[in-house]
């Protein structure tokens, strides 16, 4: 089966919709997380992904990203200072979900998400941390490339790790990931492939223009 993998949508619904026009519904659609924040349409993106998974339950795989992870900390009241979350795209996400939002009512907004958008929050909370398909290891951020067994990677590292690709890939698998914009790695937005061809980054930085 062919795979169609999309990374780091970040609320850019129009671009996401355009990309989906190239998806053959016979192929497996894999969403690498970071569906929310930064762009104006986080709610619409989440709704679209939920609808796709409901319509094609065997053809749509959804992974969690670090931005979904931050959202869970926010709605669960585990975030001591929400400022970094809010200035890193969280406020755009809140505006997308909550109309007539009071941006100063941080705790109240979290409660609205938990109560009025429980289905969306549960969907994001229950997204996978990784997906293995044959010789492909598909993650949001990467994996612990210093561990003897990649499956010992913490959930935190699957979502947040940086520069794991600087270490040799000893898994025997090809790791496809996002999280780090490819322009930070080779100064262009095209996919980046490591010299050993066992690491592939597909985060084209759509939300950055």
Predicted feature locations:
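N-terminal active-site segment of His-dependent metallophosphoesterases
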Residues: 1-48, 52-54
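Residue-level marker for buried hydrophobic side chains located in beta-strands
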Residues: 5, 29-31, 62-63, 137, ...
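Active-site glycine-centered loops adjacent to acidic/histidine catalytic or metal-binding residues
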Residues: 8, 34, 65-66, 179, ...
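Short, glycine/acidic-enriched loop or turn micro-motifs at the edges of active sites
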Residues: 10-11, 37, 69, 143, ...
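Short glycine-/acidic-enriched loop or helix-start segments at secondary-structure transitions
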Residues: 16, 41-42, 72-74, 148-150, ...
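A general structural motif
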Residues: 25-27, 57-59, 134, 171-173
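Active-site neighborhood of divalent metal-dependent phosphoester bond hydrolases
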Residues: 38-128
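Acidic, His/Gly-enriched loop-helix segments that form or flank divalent-metal centers
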Residues: 95, 100-209
């Amino acid at each position: 089966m062919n795979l169609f993998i999309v990374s780091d949508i970040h609320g850019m619904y129009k671009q996401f919709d355009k990309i989906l026009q190239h998806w053959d519904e016979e192929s497996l659609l894999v969403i690498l997380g970071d569906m929310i924040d930064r762009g104006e349409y986080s709610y619409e993106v989440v709704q679209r992904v939920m609808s796709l998974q409901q319509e094609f339950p065997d053809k749509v795989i959804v992974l969690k990203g670090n931005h979904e992870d931050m959202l869970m900390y926010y709605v669960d009241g585990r975030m001591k200072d929400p400022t970094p979350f809010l200035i890193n795209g969280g406020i755009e996400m809140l505006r997308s979900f909550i109309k007539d939002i009071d941006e100063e009512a941080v705790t109240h907004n979290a409660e609205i998400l938990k109560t009025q958008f429980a289905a969306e929050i549960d969907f994001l909370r229950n997204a996978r941390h990784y997906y293995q398909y044959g010789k492909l290891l598909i993650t949001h951020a990467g994996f612990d490339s210093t561990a003897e067994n990649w499956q010992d990677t913490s959930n935190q590292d699957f979502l947040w790790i940086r520069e794991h690709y600087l270490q040799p890939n000893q898994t025997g698998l090809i790791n496809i990931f996002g999280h780090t914009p490819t322009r930070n790695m080779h100064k262009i937005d095209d996919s980046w492939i490591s010299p050993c061809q066992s690491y592939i980054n597909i985060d084209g930085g759509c939300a950055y223009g």
